[in-house]
Structures are given as C-alpha cells and as structure tokens.
C-alpha cells in the first residue's frame, strides 16, 4: 500500500482518567482508512506499563471498566513505555500517510490529543492540526435529528482498537443517514 496524503489516521487511547495533569495513558491503538473510510490497516495495539500505585489510584469508573476489560492487568504486565509506543505507532503510520497530512480522527479525539500533547508530543506532531471528531456529529444529530440515533448503538467496550472500529462504523452510519452519501 502506497503512502497517500488522503488517508485518515484513527487513534484511540484509554487513560487512567480524564485529566492529563494527573492521569496517564494505559493503551493506544491505531487504524488507517482511506478517504472513504475503508480500513487499510490496523496498527499496533499497545498497553503501556503503569505502576501498581498508578493503577490502584484510578477513579472507580476506570478501576471497574479497565479491570473488567483486562486492560489494567495488561498495563501492569506490559514492558512498553510511552516512548516505545510513540516510536512503534509512527513507524506504522509512515507506511500509509505523510507527516502533517492526516487530521487526527476518532471519538472525542480532543481528549486523546490533550494526552498526546503531554505524554506523546512527537506523535501529536505527526498529525495535521485539524481533527475529525465523530462525537461532534453525534452531538449535532442529538440536537437536530435525534431519531437518527436510534439506528446506531455502540458496545462501549473501552478497549482502544474496538473503540476505533466503532468510531469508523459510526461515521459511516452518519455519512449514510445524515449526508446521504
């Protein structure tokens, strides 16, 4: 597959909470699609090592959700740090999209970008400054045409790769039902 500036990079991260000032990244996954949202490749799915102290001090929602999904234990056992995750992810991206070309794509992607700025600035720098945030469409549809939302539901597993797949499927749904494309 050739490098193409029209390809889109989808990233999702799972964190220990919502605040990059105190919380950290537990997992990162990446998918590249073409401009028509066809999946071209799934990148590395990396659990990032965090100490027992960090994992034991997550908020209750994170303890329950990441414990149930197995992510807490994967993070505990992982030998991957943030720098390794960045290097592996960029190595993958370089095969599909040039630096600075793709907006960062995902659901509530501004949150992921905040964590990238703090913990993974080299990765954040790989993206165009724009975002394709599926949650923006969801919020607009909720207000302007809420009946459309009845046709789409997400499992909400809160594992990074599954969340990206759901985000892509959700954008495909909106493309068909809102934009009629």
Swiss-Prot record:
Its top-level enzyme class, in one word, is: hydrolase
Q: Which SUPFAM superfamilies match?
A: Ribonuclease H-like
Which sites are catalytic?
A: 129
Q: Which Pfam families match?
A: RNase_T (PF00929)
Tell me which NCBIfam families the record gives. Answer: PRK05359.1 (NF003765)
| Signal peptide as annotated in the record | none
Q: Which gene encodes it?
A: orn
Domain (Exonuclease): residue spans on this chain: 8-171
Do you know which Gene3D superfamilies this protein is assigned to?
Ribonuclease H-like superfamily/Ribonuclease H (3.30.420.10)
Q: What does this protein do?
A: 3'-to-5' exoribonuclease specific for small oligoribonucleotides.
Q: Which SMART domains match?
A: EXOIII
UniProt xrefs under InterPro entries: Exonuclease_RNaseT/DNA_pol3, Oligoribonuclease, RNaseH-like_sf, RNaseH_sf
Q: What is this protein called?
A: Oligoribonuclease
Compartments annotated for it: namely: Cytoplasm
The GO annotation for biological process reads: DNA metabolic process
Q: What family does the entry list?
A: Belongs to the oligoribonuclease family.
User: What does the UniProt keyword field contain?
Assistant: Cytoplasm, Exonuclease, Hydrolase, Nuclease
GO molecular function of the protein, one example? Answer: nucleic acid binding
């Amino acid at each position: 597959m050739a490098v193409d500036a029209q390809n889109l990079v989808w990233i999702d991260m799972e964190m220990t909470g919502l605040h990059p000032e105190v919380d950290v990244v537990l997992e990162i996954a990446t998918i590249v699609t073409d401009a028509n949202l066809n999946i071209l490749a799934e990148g590395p799915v990396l659990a990032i090592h965090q100490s027992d102290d960090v994992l034991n001090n997550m908020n209750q929602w994170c303890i329950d959700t990441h414990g149930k999904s197995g992510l807490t234990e994967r993070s505990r056992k992982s030998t991957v740090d943030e720098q390794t995750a960045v290097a592996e992810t960029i190595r993958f991206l370089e095969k599909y999209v040039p630096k600075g070309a793709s907006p960062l794509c995902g659901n509530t992607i501004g949150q992921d970008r905040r964590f990238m700025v703090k913990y993974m600035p080299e990765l954040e720098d790989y993206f165009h400054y724009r975002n394709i945030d599926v949650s923006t469409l969801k919020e607009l549809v909720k207000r302007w045409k809420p009946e459309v939302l009845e046709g789409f539901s997400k499992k909400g597993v809160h594992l990074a790769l599954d969340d990206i797949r759901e985000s892509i499927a959700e954008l495909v749904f909106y493309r068909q039902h809102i934009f009629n494309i």
